[in-house]
């Protein structure tokens, strides 16, 4: 290879690296904008009220802290988490001798970040590129009917497919009418394969066939749907135990992840659902859907603080690309992101 060929190769490599970097940056900016848009209702209910209450030049006193406490509670952050945030703010104010209320805005933001930091968030690379995992990687979705399990599976399948993974869906919700049809539509949209049987079939049999097919077809990731029947915990527990047993006949570590899907619009009811489901299944992560349709997005903070279960994915819209890997820093920045014309001072 001549000197000019070497120079040309170096230039081409540099250009490709620059283009890849720009594409990645553009994608991240787009995702942040979608996240910010999706949190509009929560931001209007929580952050804008907080900003208005703090006001310019207002002094810090117990009356102000009580007003802020009420805002946090009504934003579905939860009593225990609100108490933690307020106590942290109160202690910092006392220790640092803060007087101007403008300081509180940043203190609350930092305490929320501290709550999220207690549970490390995996990187996009690790999640979607399935780094350091045994394949097929098996993810099981649980949750009551209507929270968006089917949609979540379809969007997750799409996300994994974008990273060149071979995806297989198992339609093990054989009790709900039209569940198979809906999941089949999403499988087609994501352009992935699906294993299903007729309505009323044994869910464990569907799971068994799905794992067998996934191993035979060398699938990278398997997504399992399940029925949502929390009102009958005894039957649900038996069903999940049976599903777990048949999975382990194919792969000892399966399921590798158990994701509980929750509807953000239900607010504190979502926290209660998480508590109940944790009694019947080893939940490894939360998927919080419909954040764009509610002012109750603060529930994500309470779930993290009180249940110590990591939020792994969030739904910020109806489009197939609107299921995002949860990034606590991006979430907090988007939540507190104010219009350019609004200035919050931190003296």
Can you annotate each of these PLM segments?
Residues 80, 110-347:
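P-loop/Walker A NTP-binding module and the surrounding RecA-like catalytic core of P-loop NTPases
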Residues 1-140, 162, 167-168, 338-347:
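Non-catalytic terminal/linker segments enriched in charged/polar, low-complexity residues
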């Amino acid at each position: 290879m001549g000197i000019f060929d070497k120079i040309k190769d170096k230039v081409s490599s540099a250009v490709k690296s620059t283009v890849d970097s720009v594409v990645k940056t553009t994608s991240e900016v787009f995702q942040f904008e979608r996240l910010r848009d999706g949190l509009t209702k929560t931001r209007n209910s929580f952050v804008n009220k907080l900003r208005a209450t703090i006001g310019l030049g207002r002094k810090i006193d117990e009356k102000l802290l009580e007003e802020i406490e009420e805002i946090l509670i009504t934003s579905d952050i939860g009593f225990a988490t609100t108490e933690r945030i307020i106590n942290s703010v109160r202690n910092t104010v006392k220790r640092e001798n803060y007087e101007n209320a403008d300081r509180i805005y940043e203190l609350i933001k930092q305490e929320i970040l501290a709550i999220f930091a207690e549970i490390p968030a995996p990187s996009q690379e690790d999640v979607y590129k399935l780094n350091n995992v045994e394949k097929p990687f098996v993810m099981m979705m649980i949750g009551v009917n209507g929270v968006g399990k089917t949609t979540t599976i379809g969007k997750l399948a799409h996300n994994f497919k974008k990273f060149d993974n071979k995806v297989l869906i198992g339609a093990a919700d054989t009790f709900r009418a039209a569940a198979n049809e809906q999941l089949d539509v999403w499988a087609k949209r994501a352009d992935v394969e699906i294993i299903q049987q007729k309505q009323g079939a044994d869910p464990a049999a569907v799971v068994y066939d799905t794992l067998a097919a996934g191993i035979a077809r060398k699938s990278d990731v398997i997504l399992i749907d399940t029925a949502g029947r929390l009102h009958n915990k005894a039957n649900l527990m038996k069903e999940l135990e049976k599903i777990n047993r048949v999975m382990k006949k194919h792969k000892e570590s399966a399921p590798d992840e158990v994701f509980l899907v929750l509807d953000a619009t239900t607010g504190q009811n979502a926290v209660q659902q998480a508590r109940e489901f944790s009694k019947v299944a080893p939940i490894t992560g939360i998927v919080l859907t419909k954040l764009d349709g509610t002012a109750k997005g603060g529930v994500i903070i309470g779930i993290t603080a009180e249940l110590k279960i990591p939020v792994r994915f969030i739904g910020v819209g109806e489009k197939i690309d609107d299921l995002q890997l949860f990034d606590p820093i991006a979430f907090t920045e988007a939540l507190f992101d104010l219009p350019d014309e609004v200035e919050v001072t931190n003296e």
